[in-house]
Curated annotation (Swiss-Prot):
Start and end residues of each UBA domain: 48-92
Keyword terms: Chromosome, Cytoplasm, Methylation, Nucleus, Phosphoprotein
Protein name per its UniProtKB record: Ubiquitin-associated protein 2
Pfam families, A to Z: UBAP2-Lig
Taxonomic lineage from the root: Eukaryota, Metazoa, Chordata, Craniata, Vertebrata
Function: Recruits the ubiquitination machinery to RNA polymerase II for polyubiquitination, removal and degradation, when the transcription-coupled nucleotide excision repair (TC-NER) machinery fails to resolve DNA damage. May promote the degradation of ANXA2.
Amino acid sequence: MMTSVSNDRCRGAREKPQMPTAHAAQSQKQVVQATAEQMRLAQVIFDKNDSDFEAKVKQLMEVTGKNQDECIVALHDCNGDVNKAINILLEGNSDTTSWETVGGKKKNFGRESSENKENREKRTEREASRGRGTNNRKGRGGNRVREFKGEENGIDCSQGDKPAERGKRARGRGFGRGRGRGTGRFSAQSMGTFNPADYSESMSTDGCGTKLAVWEAAQNGTDEGPEGLAKSHSMSQEPPSKSSYGLKGAWKNSVEEWTTEDWTEDLSETKVFTASSAPAENHVTPGHSIDLVALLHKPAPPTQATEVNSFETSQQQGFGQALVFTNSQHNNQMAPGTANSTSASSYSPQSLSSVLGSGFGELPQSNMVNISNSQILDKLKPPGLSPFPAASSAQQNDTASPPATTAAWDLKPSAPQPSVLSRLDFKSQPEPSPVLSQLSQRQQHQTQAVSVPPPGLESFSSLAKPRESTAGDGPSTVSRLLQLPNMTVENIVSAHQPQPKHIKLPKRRVPPASKVPVSAVEMPGSSDVTGLNVQFGALEFGSEPSLSEFGSAASASENSNQIPISLYPKSLSEPLNASFPMTSAVQSSTYTTSVVTSSTLTSSALSSTSPVTTSSSYDQSSVHTRIAYQSSASPPDSAPGSVANGHGGGRSQHTVDTTSSVPAPKKTDPSALPSVSTLPGPASCTALLPSSAQHTATLPSLTPAAAELSSSPLSQLSSSLSGHQNSMTSAHATRSTSTPHTHASVESTASSAAFSAAATSAPSAPSSGVVLPGSMSTVSSLCLGGTTVSVPSSSTRATALVTSGKAPPNLPQGVPPLLHNQYLVGPGGLLPAYPIYGYDELQMLQSRLPMDYYGIPFAAPTALASRDGNLANNPYSGDVTKFGRGDSASPAPPTTPAQAQQSQSQTHHTAQQPFLNPGLPPGYSYTGLPYYTGVPSAFQYGPTMFVPPTSAKQHGVALSTPPTPFQQASGYGQHAYSTGYDDLTQGTAAGDYTKGGYGGSSQAPNKSTGSGPGKGVSVSSGTGLPDMTGSVYNKTQTFDKQGFHAGTPPPFSLPSALGSTGPLAPAAAPGYAPAPFLHIMPAHQQPHSQLLHHHLQQDAPSGSGQRSQPSSLQPKSQASKPTYGSAPYWTN
């Protein structure tokens, strides 16, 4: 909807701006002046610029790869704006529906009366000046568009200078039309115009969220009520909306980070915006808090009216509900600002309320985010949003680390916090356990989240500050926090259990959310989660009791956590502090996303883990651990958040929420947890609680180890984990093992979960890979607990990965877990380079690699012999038979012979014409180990294995040798055509074959000047290989070679690959021979260009440079036929 609408908007905006003016001015002339739409249709029907349009369409098709129809539609939707059309097509914002509905009639309806239009225009202007719709839509680029939109769409009607007229219009027309269009009109106009063009980041959210919220609310049947509300609160709401816009803008950016397209899709498909939009309406005067709440409630239209009408009640009830529902929806919108959102979710009532009340660091955004957090958490949880994983992570950070949120509150809302707290207290506190429970349960990390909120409730300001101090204080602050959380946890736990229903509600939102996280979340869910579930199931969560115990266990755990904090403060504390403070700072400002997402995440990741461990240490940590595990993707983000919050668990919880793609887990931490993470709270709780005690006991022992967590704690934790975690062990075991570690583990697990599927190392391995990152060294070992032990290093990278919250994408770099198996030698990294290359790639590389001593010489002997006329056959003749030169010295017959022979094959090799050199078989079999090509540097035949490509490569390699190119052409073309070879050999035959392209080329030396270039071209034209061939190529061979070798890499001129000495300068050849692997790797890793450049240099000089590759060929070729090699051929 959004997409189509947005396009509508885009086009409509353009057209409408024209039309409204025209209509307003010419309302009487409406008939006279065709609507913009009509005009457009007429143009479409009769296109004077048909050629232009076709050109545009072609351009679009080329750029976007879409089919003609799509491109045409996009072009029409974009009013012929190719760039916009490209953006729309690439962004997946198809205006197809919008475009269809954009008809002038609706616009006409919008402009039913010229008076209305005029009034509307005036109103729009007024409002714009007033800073209402248009100004609010500043971000959307909306003043100009907005005016027309408002006028045409009656969007501004609710605002209205003419409330009655406007209201009627807006309601009747705007809403009616909106409804008629399925709110598409408003959405389309508000969101559509800018959305496709991305006029402004916050446009869709702002326009859609706020404006649309109102309209949608009206459309939702709250037309008049919401409209009235909108009218009454419109102004007040709008400004908050604006703030929200700011948030949303930031959020949108975040979302873009989270894959805005996905979200757009989800929102559009899910019509989350509908609820979302209505909530915008709900942005009532209550202030940012209300805005947030309204936004939160937006997702839940039912609660919207209530919330708007009585935000307080709404907040209390709606908070749970709205948060729950809103969470889902806002998760979508707010995901970007998830960090805060999550944290709100975590301790949704308190955090949310406070955050909402406080307005977070950035009141609108933060508030929104916080609420969103819960919403997001809900959403994340049920859907197990992967896109939000980062957001989730961030959210989890928030959740996990109210401190982050609190920090933000501290920074900004500290003062407001008291009120927020009171507000929270009346809402969150009374509601908190319910709401928090709901949220918590939904969020799986509720316990943690709840724990956190209690501290937050206790005093968000103080909490925030303590949390901030937690970074430094860690233990003491954590103790407070943890202890509070323990109390809260217990309360929450009880409340927590009731909350499942809320979770379910979010589930309905799940589809959009889950849609995004499918890969990230599902992977853990499907592979790890299943295994984990089994494990955890076996593990016995004792979920319910566990949770209850969890609270008490949390105390012990928290103590342990405190210990870990102390420990971490030692090792992680610094990072923790750094990240923590950072988190606090971030929290205060960007905290939601940025902290969670990366800086905090990365730096926090380690510290996060420890903080997570610390704060997670309380049962929630375990409960959420599983959740975190599930949320794995999110967890990484959350981890930092957790750290920041000092509630590792919270963060983990967040992760859990994210992970808790299994909505059930969210609902029921205990039962769901097992299913969701299995690691989940129950497992953690049960095992953890008991283990918590154990951990408490163990942790003390571990505590020392904790400092060394990486190694000894790992074993210790492993031990505890073993008993404790069982299969859950690694990731979850770690988690359970020590609350702190558990959290680290959880965080790791969360990360792992994020990567979990990716990091298949083990159920825990995934966690280890990603999850460990948070814990990094300490937790990493811990988390690795077994599976992830290796992950620690990886884990570090994982941290970064986690930071992104999309571990899998990041995995490749730092996380071998996913990929190392792919590499021949994942860990070694040596062979892996080769595995990187395919046969073709190797061929390509080889062509670039300095020619082996044998590589070209082989080609030279045969090729030169046959090519005598063309290239200096002397070197090759000599080379083949003798090691006359260093270059040809290698009896390079094997490899180069393939090439040379192929060249000759072109020439005389027609008979010979084995794609593989005769020597190839031995080389072939030996070279069968192309990766060991370096080994047989002396082995002439080794390279031949790839000779067939070699000939191609040789062409490329012996770029200097016209034969090479021709060989290639002939080798490929003529090889295919036996006659071709003969023809090539004979200038005439070649001429016949290639029409002088090859013949000339083959005999290029003879006809090189005349034919060389042309031949090269001809060859390329006539033969597939000609690119490489022809004087043109020889001349350009440095590049062509690269290109060719890339295109048709010489098979394996193993000499190059082998590093045989060969055409490369003899000295270079030895160097290469010794480091063939290196060369191949460098060629591949570095661009092939370096090697290529080698060759290129070698080749490009044709004489000297070429010498390296065809070395003997080239120099001699130059010598023998300076014309061909030097002037004509190379010049050509």
